């Protein structure tokens, strides 16, 4: 068994404005046994200075890696190779998640022996004032194919590591 229940991989490029809010939402998750893998994809802004503060404050939880720019897919692939969790989650560095998200996903995955657990999401305006529920993912049973492949989003799911470690994201995308 791995040390962590969930490894969360965050590719980082040009997000110094958002990365603190993202990391705050992850270090404060109600699921304690998580590993946060931050992959700096060669960003030139001050994101790494912010990341370093979190690594120092949460050394058992936040891990930072710096690599040459290869795009979001390349950074996710790199992060997956570092992951030690039983499940893998992905968060975009300009996003944040609700504090119970990974606990709920993990508990559902374990209780139902799932390879993938999926949750809904909100679309939030730049000023954080307008939250709109994205209904596309709310009823998985009604729309399984679209939930898995329609949006091609990875940030509202956890995947059993044994499933995704055999796959790779395309590099040089975004």
Language model features: what each stretch is:
Residues 100-131:
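Conserved donor NDP-sugar-binding/catalytic core segment of glycosyltransferases
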Residues 25, 40-49, 71:
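A conserved acidic beta->alpha catalytic loop
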Residues 88:
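Short aromatic/hydrophobic "clamp" motif used to bind/position activated sugar donors
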Residues 20, 45-54, 96, 100:
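Acidic helix N-cap motif at the loop->helix transition within catalytic regions
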Residues 1-28:
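N-proximal low-complexity "stem/linker" segments adjacent to membrane-targeting elements
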Residues 67-83:
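Glycine-rich, basic loop-to-helix element that forms the pyrophosphate-binding segment
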Residues 33-43, 63-68, 93:
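Short beta-strand/loop segment that forms part of the nucleotide-sugar
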Residues 143-174:
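Conserved nucleotide-sugar donor-binding catalytic segment
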